Regions:
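Conserved phosphate-binding catalytic cores of ATP/NTP-utilizing and phosphoryl-transfer enzymes
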Residues: 17, 22-45
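A cross-family phosphate/adenosyl-ligand binding-site feature
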Residues: 19, 47, 94, 109, ...
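Glycine-rich phosphate-binding loop plus the immediately following alpha-helix
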Residues: 23-26, 62-106, 128-138
Length: 174
């Protein structure tokens, strides 16, 4: 954004076209309703936005009135997927590979630490550390630990991340 904004302004000025500022996260939320045939949802509603850099719960009162009620404190959910995948030796982006291998795994094979944040904010750094320590301990005992447990590890990682998201969203609904 830091580099793109001046370039965008210069381009718009040079082409004599308007430059319309759009909030990146609002665009994520409202992009689903761009289709002219789609009806806007009833307001208010909650939106869970998950990406590599952001994890947010947003209360939407109208297309122009939004309130973030839970946000990323350290690492976002997408980053937790990608960093976990890196620990497993997968290429970037790792989230799709974790999802692929998780389909054949047992979600209860491994348990990882859960964040102890009481409000609606998200923290995935502790979970990432727990995943790292579990894998390091397994590799110390068995050099083939990742290969032999890849599906179960992926299923357990995915389950842990998604459970955190669902728990926070459920709390926000109440």
């Amino acid at each position: 954004l830091h580099d793109a904004l001046p370039i965008s302004k210069s381009f718009a000025m040079g082409m004599d076209i308007p430059l319309i500022a759009v909030n990146h996260m609002q665009a994520h939320i409202l992009a689903h309703f761009i289709d002219k045939g789609k009806q806007l949802p009833s307001f208010p509603f909650l939106c869970l936005t998950v990406s590599g850099g952001h994890t947010q719960i947003v209360k939407i009162d109208s297309p122009s009135k939004m309130q973030v009620i839970g946000t990323t404190l350290d690492d976002a959910a997408g980053e937790a997927f990608d960093k976990s995948a890196k620990i497993l030796g997968f290429s970037y982006p790792g989230g799709p590979l974790i999802d692929k291998y998780a389909k054949g795994g047992n979600i209860h094979a491994f348990t990882f630490g859960k964040p102890k944040i009481k409000d609606l904010d998200f923290s995935f750094s502790g979970l990432k550390t727990s995943i790292l320590y579990t894998i390091q301990a397994g590799m110390k005992e068995n050099p083939n630990f990742i290969a032999e447990n890849k599906e179960d590890l992926c299923a357990s990682i995915q389950h842990s991340i998604v459970t955190i998201l669902i728990d926070k969203l459920t709390k926000a609904i109440k």
